[in-house]
Amino acid sequence: MNKNYSYPLDLSWSTEELASVLSFFNNVEAAYEQKVQAEKLLKSYEAFKQVVPSKGQEKRIGREFENVSGYSLYHAVQEAKSKGKGSISLGK
């Protein structure tokens, strides 16, 4: 996948909010490119949900992220929730 893509960010977010969203995106990327601890991904998802509480906005950001990266926020979170503990890897 193209490594030179832009994250779907809202410029009205504070620095801390941007950091939370970027951390979540990075953990999703890690789940596809290497592996990531399920707990770490879920913790970053909780922080992401503090910034993006609306399900509609979450879906929109998820679609935008998947369009540019090829990685699904939804699938990564679902895999982490089903695994609970340990590492997850969604790479081919």
Swiss-Prot record:
Source organism superkingdom: Bacteria
Family membership noted in the UniProt record: Belongs to the UPF0223 family.
HAMAP family for this protein: UPF0223
Protein name: UPF0223 protein SSA_0938
Organism, scientific name: Streptococcus sanguinis (strain SK36)
